[in-house]
């Protein structure tokens, strides 16, 4: 049963540079259909949450370049609740702004924070875990979802739970410590230990609770945000444009979670979470032929294996190549070693250095 004071905050300000050349400033990863499912990633995120949080209680923070496209894709989310941040200031100011807004709209607001561009393979199980986190937030706790690690990943932060924590129970336990992204050797130790979980970037709290946390641990930003008028005030947008860029550029993890003493976590079993962080991740999610090729285009392949192809309506012929990413758009083509998928963002940096703004 959905509660009327449950809200969802979707963070949708990322650029998705590792998905170049599909992901661009005005068509970032979160508004793309990457071939997994029938809708775009942000549409899927909103649809997934609907049994607990209907669209009218969804709020989205994004950037000025992609806001209009998000409004177009999500007609059931009130347009005034899709807000473009005036500057990039990481997750602590963004969440603080959302908490200020929600507390002015509903003093009893409890909200979950969700990335806009992740895949969830088992939505039903996911919602059960989300409900458990919301129940903890009702008790003025800060709740996080920890995902049971499936391999020793070095690209995620980890959450340390008490030894003996059992995954999959729909209850929360105190979080011992947040760990930074580890080296491979340490990541292997985390997985073997059995009580370290991936930090999936999903958090739950009362608006009042996280505002208290910001006042205690990030007072400069909290003071700036508290100077804003209530949401809906005629000067609200102008004041946000002036105040928000002055906030500290820091994540909510560093600003509050690592310092707070009221953080609990749900030690989640496998609900099919995937942050879809690169073209390689898409390759892993899609069906593959007998030679391990995955393609969104018509494919002719000979003596070729392990390739990912996304070239629209074109027929793509592969001959004697392996483990490539091939992505074709009207003005750019990416050909990359699939093992270097995490480095595709470096191409965007190179284009920025060359001032090829039309390509980013």
Question: Across the structure, where does each feature detected by a protein language model lie?
Answer:
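Left-handed beta-helix
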Residues: 2-5, 207-360
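Short beta-strand segments
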Residues: 10-12, 61, 112-115, 144-148, ...
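Conserved N-terminal catalytic core of the sugar/cofactor nucleotidyltransferase
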Residues: 1-10, 18-25, 35-127, 131, ...
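Conserved core of the sugar-phosphate nucleotidyltransferase
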Residues: 123-244, 264, 338
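Short coil/turn connectors at secondary-structure junctions
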Residues: 3-7, 55-56, 78-79, 106-109, ...
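Residue-level signal for inorganic ion chemistry
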Residues: 42, 98, 117, 159, ...
């Amino acid at each position: 049963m959905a509660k009327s004071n449950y809200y969802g905050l979707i963070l949708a300000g990322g650029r998705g540079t590792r998905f170049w050349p599909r992901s661009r400033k005005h068509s970032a990863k979160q508004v793309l259909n990457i071939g997994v499912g029938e809708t775009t990633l942000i549409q899927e995120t909103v649809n997934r949450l609907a049994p607990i949080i209907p669209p009218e209680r969804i709020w989205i923070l994004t950037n000025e370049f992609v806001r209009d496209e998000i409004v177009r894709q999500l007609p059931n989310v009130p347009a005034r609740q899709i807000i473009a941040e005036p500057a990039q200031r990481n997750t602590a100011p963004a969440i603080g702004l959302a908490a200020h807004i929600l507390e002015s709209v509903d003093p009893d607001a409890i909200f979950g924070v969700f990335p806009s561009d992740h895949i969830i393979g088992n939505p039903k199980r996911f919602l059960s875990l989300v409900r458990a986190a919301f129940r903890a937030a009702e008790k003025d706790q800060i709740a996080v979802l920890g995902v049971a690690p499936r391999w020793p990943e070095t690209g995620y932060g980890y959450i340390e739970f008490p030894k003996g924590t059992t995954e999959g129970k729909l209850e929360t336990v105190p979080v011992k410590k947040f760990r930074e992204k580890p080296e491979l050797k340490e990541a292997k130790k985390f997985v073997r230990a059995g009580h370290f979980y991936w930090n999936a970037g999903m958090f739950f709290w009362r608006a009042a609770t996280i505002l208290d946390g910001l006042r205690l641990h990030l007072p400069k930003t909290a003071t700036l945000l508290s100077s804003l008028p209530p949401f809906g005030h005629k000067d609200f947008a102008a004041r946000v444009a002036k105040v928000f860029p002055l906030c500290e550029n820091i994540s909510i993890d560093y600003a509050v979670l690592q310092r707070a003493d009221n953080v609990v976590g749900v030690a989640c079993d496998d609900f099919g979470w995937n942050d879809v962080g690169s073209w390689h991740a898409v390759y892993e999610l899609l069906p593959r032929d007998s030679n391990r090729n995955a393609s969104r285009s018509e494919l002719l392949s000979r003596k070729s294996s392990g390739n990912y192809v996304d070239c629209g309506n074109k027929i793509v012929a592969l001959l004697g190549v392996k483990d490539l990413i091939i992505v074709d758009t009207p003005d750019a083509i990416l050909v990359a070693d699939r093992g270097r998928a995490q480095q595709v963002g470096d191409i965007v940096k190179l284009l920025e250095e060359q001032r090829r703004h039309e390509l980013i």
